[in-house]
Amino acid sequence: ALRLRKKGYEFQDARRDHWPAADLSLTSAFPKLPDRAAAPERLRDALKRDAERVAAGRLRFFGHLDVQTDTPPNWQRDYLAGVDVPTGKSAFKLNHRELPDGAAIKPLWEPSRWAGPVRLAQACWLLGNRRSGEHCLDWLEDWVANNPPYTGWHWTSALESGMRLIAFTWIDA
């Protein structure tokens, strides 16, 4: 029954020649950020702590490994193996299974998933910490400068690019 209902909506939408405009007023149901005053104190404390940790280059890899990095990170470094793996090659000619000197691709990708900049952006918005926002932008600008499109390890996976897009939407919110 649910599948038929979904197909019915798809059929109706396919024939629609006029889509309603998005209602961005304060009374609309369109998603928007919550009121800052409603944020619990525990969240504020956690954001303050995380922003200080990230600004000092202490990142959490895979949700549980605390790793000291440069700030901004060296985007071409596997911090777990302590190995730099710079390359100027096209991402389409790289094989992430053939990294040199014991390096692995996942620790190399982890800082580029932008969990740190997301927390910095959240701290900027919720706590009014302008320095966290500037720090977030510094990291993003450094990433862009050091990872040209389709060049290097960070462009070998469409999934990783998608994760960066999701993180960017959080930062941009």
Task: Give the positions of each predicted feature.
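Aromatic-lined, polymer-binding surfaces characteristic
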Residues: 85-89, 97-98, 102-173
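Extended, charge-enriched "interface" segments that sit outside catalytic cores
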Residues: 2-99, 106-111
